[in-house]
């Protein structure tokens, strides 16, 4: 099989992780930046461009031809129009962002865009613990909580691409308000940010 190379980006509320990988899942280069998610969408896009240019420079030095970029982002993503619609409460101003268009203009490389948890779940199905399985449920816990469901080897998106937002499944009836506008969501009680929010007052009282 002829090797093909791509840049993969995992955008989160805490960090931006990026890598140069091939079509067999082998990593050639990895990097990480502290996310500017609390600043603005423009600041975050600038970080993505910086990360991509760093990976591009490495690839050029080694003589690897990059075929494209894959970006995983929190929130609700319109994959057809390649737009972040919203729903990423941990990134300031991250809504109605034509992210793939921005990245292609800035870098000259074609870009694919998807929900971060969905893409991680698909990657785990193809290369990780889910290899050989036709049905997979994937859960990621970090600044927020995301999830993916793979049925017959294909991602299940549900209505308006919101079907696997597992972090916003109501966990506690009449629970505390979540940043998404609902109440009692899993993410509000079990993400790393919520853990700090819920436990810090108790720690300070000790």
Language-model segments: residues:
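Short glycine-rich, Thr/Ser-proximal phosphate-binding strand/loop in the N-terminal lobe
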Residues: 3-44, 83-86, 161
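Conserved small/polar residues in nucleotide/adenosyl-binding loops
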Residues: 196-202
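Short glycine-aspartate micro-motif
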Residues: 6-10, 66-70, 136-140, 179
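Glycine-rich phosphate-binding loop and adjoining helix at the ATP-binding site
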Residues: 37, 41-49, 64-69, 76-135
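Residue-level signal for inorganic ion chemistry
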Residues: 71, 195
